[in-house]
């Protein structure tokens, strides 16, 4: 029997990158996947491919999430954005946007999913954090602050959910081969005053012992285990997948 057979999994930012890799891995293990994304066409395409369903949702429109009731055995909070800039020139609106998407929206989705999870006596909440949830890098104040907040939210969820069979964990990758990371390269080059071709070696991977990007499928493999039946005693923790960055 597949490890996620009969489970309903909602994955935000699920139409591409890490989210899509997780959706494919979950579906391969028997889960019914709900691809939640603002890109309706991409979400529908992947949902059709995997025999799941799509959910067009703008997670920045948080007012619509406040009264939401979310049916999910597994919730993956994955949607995210990035902005690289020094604090003194960081746009306040972008700061708020990042925190709304990456901290307030996960809180509201967890809030919406917990009643059903509690009723069924089972739930898996996976929060796609980052090594930046545990460490800091210059020029990423909003992202680092939001991820640190997500770490705290995940731990509180673990404590409250434990009596009801609900676990909550963070996954903390380093730089993953996604469009989000690729889009940072130009910003990093400008901020650090170096050519784009030098960004990976001189900025992104300087602290990592393993000098390569994390592949989305590697993150998905860990997520699939955490969502499954063998991880019931794993909760309130953060799984680092950063090639040794945080070992320093």
List the predicted regions and their residue ranges.
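Active-site helix of classical SDR
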Residues: 110, 146, 154
């Amino acid at each position: 029997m597949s490890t996620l057979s009969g489970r309903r999994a909602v994955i935000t930012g699920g139409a591409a990158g890490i989210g899509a890799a997780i959706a494919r891995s979950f579906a391969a293990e028997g889960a019914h996947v709900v691809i939640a994304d603002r890109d309706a066409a991409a979400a529908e395409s992947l949902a059709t491919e995997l025999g799941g369903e799509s959910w067009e949702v703008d997670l920045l429109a948080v007012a619509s999430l406040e009264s939401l009731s979310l049916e999910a055995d597994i919730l993956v909070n994955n949607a995210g954005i990035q902005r690289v800039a020094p604090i003194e020139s960081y746009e306040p609106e972008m700061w708020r946007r990042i925190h709304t998407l990456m901290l307030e929206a996960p809180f509201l989705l967890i809030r919406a999913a917990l009643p059903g999870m509690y009723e069924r006596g089972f739930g898996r909440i996976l929060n796609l954090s980052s090594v930046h949830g545990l460490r800091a890098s210059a020029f990423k104040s909003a992202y680092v602050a939001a991820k640190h907040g997500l770490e705290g939210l995940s731990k509180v969820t673990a404590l409250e959910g434990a009596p009801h069979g609900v676990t909550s964990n963070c996954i903390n990758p380093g730089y993953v081969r996604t469009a989000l990371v690729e889009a940072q390269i130009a910003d990093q080059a400008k901020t650090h005053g170096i050519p784009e071709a030098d960004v990976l070696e001189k900025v992104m991977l300087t602290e990592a012992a393993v000098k390569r990007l994390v592949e989305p499928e590697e993150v998905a493999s860990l997520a699939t285990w955490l969502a499954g039946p063998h991880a019931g005693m794993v909760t309130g923790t953060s799984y680092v997948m950063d090639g040794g960055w945080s070992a320093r």
